[in-house]
Structures are given as C-alpha cells and as structure tokens.
Amino acid sequence: MSKVLALTGAGISAESGIRTFRDAGGLWENRKVEDVASPEGFKRDPVLVWEFYKERYAQSLSVQPNSAHQALVKLEEHLGDDFHLITQNVDCLHARAGSKRLYEMHGRLDSCFCVSCRTHYRMEECDLEPQTPLCQRCGNLLRPDIVWFGEIPYFLYEIEELLKNTDVFLIVGTSGVVYPAAGFVMTAKLFGAHTIGVNLEKPDNMGFI
C-alpha cells in the first residue's frame, strides 16, 4: 500500500469560519506580524500578544471541523500507519476531527507554557482573566504555545523522515509562502514522491508541485 503524507495550511479551515492570515479581513489585517507573532513582540508587549491569542483561542472554540478535516480522518482510517498529517494550523481542528498521526508543527492555540520553568498547560487549566496569565508552579509569565516567526517549528526531524519515505505528498490549503513548510514539496519530490496540490489559488511554490 502506498504511503501518503498530507500537509495542510490555513485554507483547509476557512470553511469552518477560521479567517485565513493573508486574505482580506484575515487575522493579520491591522496588525503587524512582528508585534503579535514574534519573540521580540512578546517581550515588548505581552499584553497585546495575549489579547491577540485569547481572541484566536476563543474563535477556535466557536467553530467545528469541516468536511475536509473529516475526509483526512477517513483517509487515515483507511491507510492506518501508511498515512501521516502535518499541519501548519494551530486551531486544533484536525485533532478535534479525530486525526491521530498528526504533527502540529506550529503549536496549538489550546496550549501555553511558562517562559521560566517551561511547564506546559492546557488553556482550559489556566486563569485567562489577567491580561498576562501566570504559571501556577513558579508565578512567572505564560506564553502561547505557538511557533512564532524566527523560531524553529516542532517535529522537523520526524517530518523530514516522513518526507523521505512517502509515496504521495498531498498539499491542501496552503499559500506556499511560509518556510520551512513551503519547501517540503521539494524534499518529497527529490525522494521520488508524487505530489498533489489542492488550493483555491495558485500557491507560491506551485512550480515544485
């Protein structure tokens, strides 16, 4: 049986009501990336950053996985260990839909961790009323468990191994702008995978698909 690896981006969650980053009316409109999605921005103004991510977390709780999320779950149920899913999304909709072999490379909106002792928490365990939530263990500042610009994504070693060994690489709803994910298709093709792109608009890395 062929091994299938899927990569999803913000476009797959648009039908659920999650606004995509770069569309008109998207989450980045009227906000500077460096202010709300960088370590430097968090150091400058943690209140602003937490305000942004509390809004995103609340939005993610108000929506449901859509038919595209469910289709990938069914594909996984059919293929078993021959299917794996990488997502750039942090909305947790794949996990809520039932995806098991899942790599959330940019983190999760429902998680945070202490900047000092590194203790991880689910958002539902935390008191989000303060402008800047604090660690229950050491009292220091918590930050959203999100990979910001300039930080290293999660699971890169595991993802590289999957890219080297997949037969089919499926790309769904991603702009092909954000690296390293935008370069995954090149790695997959280099190691012989067939690549399939599903997107409403031509992604920036279309030449490699």
Sequence positions of predicted segments:
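Conserved catalytic core of sirtuin-type NAD+-dependent deacylases
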Residues: 1-209
